[in-house]
Design a protein with these regions (language model features):
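Active-site phosphate-binding/coordination module
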Residues: 1-89
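Short, intrinsically disordered, charge-balanced linker/junction segments flanking boundaries
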Residues: 1-2, 109, 191-194
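A generic structural motif
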Residues: 6-10, 169, 188-190
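Glycine-rich beta-to-alpha transition loops that act as phosphate-gripper elements at the mouths
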Residues: 14-15, 173-179, 193-194
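Structural motif
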Residues: 28, 187-188
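Short hydrophobic/aromatic-enriched beta-strand-loop microsegments
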Residues: 30-38, 94, 140-142, 191-194
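Conserved acidic, metal-coordinating active-site core of Asp-based
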Residues: 64, 68-187
């Protein structure tokens, strides 16, 4: 609040999906936010963009998972809903650890999905190295049982926000508290505080 009162532009930057981060944004009185791992931009409380994952990369990952009998779920919108054609993911690794609405439909055709925001694979750490399409998209492992593909470009989100604001990049000061914030730290561009 003191930074805002002093005339500074203040912005939350998170890897979380927009729908998840909104509560925190409002609770801590941020009008502006970079979310969805750098792919979402909220300006003055309004979601301006929320770019999905690269579709071709997503399709390759899901196809390989299906060929190898690996359960998958996909987030195709900005909500806690995940979609799949069966419950193979749940059979293999159990339910996800966060609030989730499962929409499982044998007629679900992932090739007809317009946008993918996250992909969850029932792929443990030992199998991960042999998954050929892993590098098609950024991935993170918060749970040992499954691998999650989601945007991971908070630094890119900072660039987008500054471009929208038409503000100099060297004015940026970032604060981070964990390894997932390292992407934002670039001493050659701006000031970072850990």
């Amino acid at each position: 609040e003191k930074l805002k009162q002093a005339g500074h532009f203040v912005c939350l930057n998170t890897g979380r999906a927009h729908y998840k981060a909104e509560k925190t944004r409002k609770e801590f009185n941020f009008e502006n936010m970079v979310c969805n791992g750098g792919n979402g931009i909220v300006l003055d409380g309004i979601l301006k963009e929320n770019i999905p994952l690269d579709k071709q990369g997503a399709l390759k990952i899901i196809q390989e998972a299906k060929e190898k009998g690996i359960g998958y779920l996909v987030a195709i919108n900005d909500s806690q809903e995940v979609y799949g054609e069966n419950d193979l993911f749940i059979q293999q690794v159990g339910y996800r650890k966060e609030p989730t609405t499962y929409i499982l439909d044998q007629d679900f055709d992932y090739t007809q999905v317009e946008n993918f925001y996250k992909i969850y694979l029932a792929l443990d750490e030992k199998e991960e190295a042999s998954f050929q399409n892993k590098d098609q998209l950024g991935s993170l492992r918060f749970e040992k049982e499954y691998l999650m593909f989601q945007p991971d470009n908070k630094k890119g989100g900072i660039f987008k926000m500054m471009e929208i604001l038409q503000a100099p990049i060297q004015d940026v000061v970032v604060f981070g508290d964990d390894y997932n914030d390292l992407d934002m730290f670039d001493k050659d561009l701006w000031t970072g505080v850990a």
